[in-house]
Regions:
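Mobile beta-alpha loop/short-helix "lid" or hinge segments that flank ligand
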Residues: 60, 64-65, 158-160, 175-176
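Conserved amphipathic alpha-helical segments that form helical-bundle/coiled-coil interaction surfaces
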Residues: 103-168, 181-185, 197-208
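Positions in alpha-helical segments
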Residues: 72, 80, 98, 117, ...
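Amphipathic, non-transmembrane alpha-helical scaffold segments
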Residues: 13, 86-89, 131-135, 176, ...
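Short linear motifs at protein or domain termini
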Residues: 1-98, 102, 214-232
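Short helix-capping and inter-helix turn/linker motifs at the boundaries of alpha-helical repeat units
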Residues: 11, 109-110, 174-177
């Protein structure tokens, strides 16, 4: 069924980008599949130029690979990718927390605590989307204060690659419960003024692939691409 042409205050390229990302998030464009530019252009009612520009952005972010004269492939998220992303996010968030530490006052800490309480409520109500949103907002408090927009952009893009590609439909409750404990421990370190310890905890526990591996395997167990590119 043909989709109505996109009408929005955003540029056509931005609209097409948002559409493609939403298709990936919902699992309509699965890892390993291909994108037909001709068909997609007709479906959206746009020319190939904004579509090409959107695909170039997606390629820079690691979501697709453009093969000249061969087509566009939606990238597979392999176990090695996940390991690499955890290393990168851990290092960057650790740096961000150190840079922002002196700006984390009572209002910011209360905001972070509020997100933790929201995560607990989300687990009780089996609302994964709410849990995910509160989790992101917790980290966004110190990311937003670190003063490095490039760092923040990279972290957010990698999180989308990890958890929005496509969005999993259920909890790994043991992981979410453990994660809440980690957020509470991080808040405790921040409250005690232990900047170095808090930064190390982010890097070496919260974003440690080795620490989180058993949960990661459960989270991606329904993703064939994960197992086909399994532990190396």
């Amino acid at each position: 069924m043909k989709t109505k042409p996109l009408i929005n205050i955003k540029s056509l390229k931005e609209q097409v980008y948002d559409y493609l990302r939403e298709q990936m998030r919902r699992g309509e464009m699965l890892p390993g599949s291909t994108i037909d530019m001709e068909e997609t252009s007709k479906q959206l009612g746009v020319s190939k130029t904004p579509l090409r520009d959107a695909l170039l952005q997606l390629e820079m972010e690691g979501f697709v690979t453009i093969y000249p004269r061969r087509g566009i492939a939606v990238n597979i998220l392999s176990i090695q990718d996940i390991k690499n992303y955890y290393d990168i996010i851990g290092a960057l968030e650790s740096t961000a927390l150190l840079r922002a530490f002196g700006k984390l006052g009572e209002p910011e800490i209360k905001t972070m605590q509020k997100q933790v309480e929201g995560m607990k409520a989300a687990i009780k109500s089996d609302n994964f989307d709410s849990y995910y949103e509160k989790n992101l907002k917790f980290h966004d408090v110190y990311l937003g204060l670190c003063g490095n927009e490039n760092l923040v952009r990279i972290v957010r893009t990698l999180k989308k690659r990890l958890y929005d590609f496509p969005r999993q439909k259920g909890f790994v409750k043991e992981w979410e419960t453990a994660s809440i404990g980690e957020h509470e421990e991080l808040l405790s370190l921040i409250n005690q003024g232990k900047a170095a310890e808090a930064a190390a905890y982010i890097r070496d526990v919260h974003w440690s692939f080795k620490v989180q591996e058993k949960y990661i395997s459960q989270y991606y167990k329904k993703t064939p691409e994960f197992w086909n590119n399994g532990p190396r």
